[in-house]
Amino acid sequence: MSFDLKNDISKKIHFIGIGGVSMSGLAEILLERGFKVSGSDMNGSPMIDKLKEHGAEIYLGHNEKNINNVDIVVYTAAIPEDNPELIYARKNNISLMTRAEFLGSLMKGHKYNIAISGTHGKTTTTSMVSHIALTEDVDPTILVGGNLDIINGNVLAGKSDYFITEACEYKASFLEFYPYIGVILNIDADHLDYYKNIDDIENTFAKFVNLIPKEGYLIANADDKRVARVASNATCNVVSFGIDNGDIRAKNISFNESGFSSFDVYKSSELLFNIELNVPGKHNILNALSAIASALTLKISHKSIIDGLKSFKGTHRRFEIKGVKNGITVIDDYAHHPTEIKATLDAAKNYPHNKIYCVFQPHTYSRTLSLFDDFSNSFSGVDELVLADIYAAREKDTGVVSSLKLSEAINKNGVKSSNLHSFEDIVNYFKSKLNDGDILLTVGAGDVFKIGEMFLSK
């Protein structure tokens, strides 16, 4: 099944789970372009309210009666097979498409698709590329995994041939895409509930590269051995980036007192320009280099690259300063993989502080178990760590792994750590601990951000 953005305008599209970040974004793009849209979700949300305002039919709860004169039903991997709307659509031969298939079909209607992949950094890099494209005024369509202030949300329905989106490797969903420019930021072990091992993940990224046409471009991190290996077999044009290696490199790097970097950008031996970032950490230099390489490939002006990156001050839940209370700075970050946690902590160490106190909420039992040893070594430099209980997401607790067990392992590695079960207990614990100049850092992909909000409101 495919969907034609230009010729299927008369079709009505129904989204099961319309309240999700990506699904609501897809629905909004369709509504902006004049399609009839309906959708269901278990709970209301600001995103759903926004879709209602744009004319979507919204149903709370899942019921076969919600499928009303629908031509295509779109669903995510999170929707179980016994969902009544999914069952009804199958029984009545209504066209079904996964979220990834549908997004791929939307991309097919554009010429310059920029698909940003990698285990870490997708949302930030997609946001950086978006800032540059908007500064250049190319009127792109944008679909990003976090809220971006410049577009007042996570989606923008542009009218040009430019389409900028994240390309997630989970369940190989990005193999449904049509990239003209494919970015690979890094390849790391994750989603081991789906993939056999890291080699399996690397092979899937190689398949993603094969989707790029010969006249298209792969933007590849030359400092990542697995990315470099995948890039060496590409049949399209390849532009590499990195700090130590690559066609596009950062030199003369310096950090200010807030941990924000400035650096010179070189193309081979040629100095192009100087960049000033307003997001912290060495990892964001690599993210910026990939955005710069993408923009140069599209012949976007140097001025728009410089100004676009300077105007980017982060997305929600990516080293987001939530507030300051009694001299204590509360910072929240979506990091849920050991590599991401280390990068976030490096950024925190470069931020002005006395002590760093951290709350980590592990995300899914399968990830916590498969990366247990890596997690136990990820919190070096934290003055004290509290683990909230594991955020289950789509999984069930088998009793094999727990936050308590992880906390004990972290203690053995020399970082003071404990496990508290309720958010209220965690907030009260830190209320008695923190002093002027300290940082409270909440980390995880679940709802751990609420702890910081509770701390600031008490």
UniProtKB/Swiss-Prot annotation:
GO cellular component: cytoplasm
Keyword hit for Transferase: no
Keyword Iron among UniProt keywords: no
GO annotation (BP), single: peptidoglycan biosynthetic process
Pathway(s): Cell wall biogenesis; peptidoglycan biosynthesis
Catalysed conversion reaction: UDP-N-acetyl-alpha-D-muramate + L-alanine + ATP = UDP-N-acetyl-alpha-D-muramoyl-L-alanine + ADP + phosphate + H(+)
EC id: 6.3.2.8
Binding site for ATP: 118-124
Matching Gene3D superfamilies: Mur ligase, C-terminal domain, Mur-like, catalytic domain, NAD(P)-binding Rossmann-like Domain
Main location per the UniProt record: cytoplasm
Pfam families hit by this protein: Mur_ligase, Mur_ligase_C, Mur_ligase_M
Keyword annotations from UniProtKB, A to Z: ATP-binding, Cell cycle, Cell division, Cell shape, Cell wall biogenesis/degradation, Cytoplasm, Ligase, Nucleotide-binding, Peptidoglycan synthesis
Molecular functions (GO terms): ATP binding; UDP-N-acetylmuramate-L-alanine ligase activity
Places the protein is found: Cytoplasm
HAMAP family: MurC (MF_00046)
Function: Cell wall formation.
Similarity remark: Belongs to the MurCDEF family.
Entry protein name: UDP-N-acetylmuramate--L-alanine ligase
Record organism: Clostridium acetobutylicum (strain ATCC 824 / DSM 792 / JCM 1419 / IAM 19013 / LMG 5710 / NBRC 13948 / NRRL B-527 / VKM B-1787 / 2291 / W)
Classification of source organism: Bacteria, Bacillati, Bacillota, Clostridia, Eubacteriales
